[in-house]
Amino acid sequence: MKIVLQRVSQASVTIEGSIHGQIEQGLLLLVGVGPDDSQEDLDYAVRKIVNMRIFSDEAGKMNKSVQDVAGKILSISQFTLFADTKKGNRPAFTGAAAPALASQLYDAFNQALSAFVPVEVGVFGADMAVSLVNDGPVTIVLDTKNK
């Protein structure tokens, strides 16, 4: 799995003109699923995300997790994280998992996250408009194959 984490003060996802999910303080996740991803990758990602200390403590030091600050997560499926740009000018997305597998793992990932923090989601495979106010900015790329 490849996941882009962005610390936000607010974020929302709009589908066909209607807000489908929104959060205040927390994390916006752009989630890509690869063909070799498994439950082990999912568990690793969830553990890292809910415990990652990227929110400021009273001294201004990044020392708190999304759980510690009672934050929320907005999770958006993003197969384009697996883009291959080696040849030509049109990216190839053959490195992403097939939609059936990706959808299953994405749903399981969000379910696992929701055991720790409130989670809002987009719609898998939909065209979405994502809005955010990046806080910091703090943006981190998590790749479960680079443990």
From Swiss-Prot:
One of its GO terms (biological process) is D-amino acid catabolic process. An aminoacyl-tRNA editing enzyme that deacylates mischarged D-aminoacyl-tRNAs. Also deacylates mischarged glycyl-tRNA(Ala), protecting cells against glycine mischarging by AlaRS. Acts via tRNA-based rather than protein-based catalysis; rejects L-amino acids rather than detecting D-amino acids in the active site. By recycling D-aminoacyl-tRNA to D-amino acids and free tRNA molecules, this enzyme counteracts the toxicity associated with the formation of D-aminoacyl-tRNA entities in vivo and helps enforce protein L-homochirality. SUPFAM superfamilies: DTD-like. This is D-aminoacyl-tRNA deacylase. Pfam families: Tyr_Deacylase (PF02580). It comes from the Bacteria. A Gly-cisPro motif from one monomer fits into the active site of the other monomer to allow specific chiral rejection of L-amino acids. Coiled coil: none annotated. GO terms for cellular component: cytoplasm. Homodimer. It catalyses: glycyl-tRNA(Ala) + H2O = tRNA(Ala) + glycine + H(+); a D-aminoacyl-tRNA + H2O = a tRNA + a D-alpha-amino acid + H(+). It is found in: Cytoplasm. Its EC number is 3.1.1.96. Belongs to the DTD family. It is an enzyme of class 3 (hydrolase). NCBIfam families: D-aminoacyl-tRNA deacylase. The gene is dtd. GO terms for molecular function: D-tyrosyl-tRNA(Tyr) deacylase activity; Gly-tRNA(Ala) deacylase activity; Ser(Gly)-tRNA(Ala) hydrolase activity; tRNA binding. CDD domains: Dtyr_deacylase. A motif (Gly-cisPro motif, important for rejection of L-amino acids) lies at residues 136-137. Keywords: Cytoplasm, Hydrolase, RNA-binding, tRNA-binding.
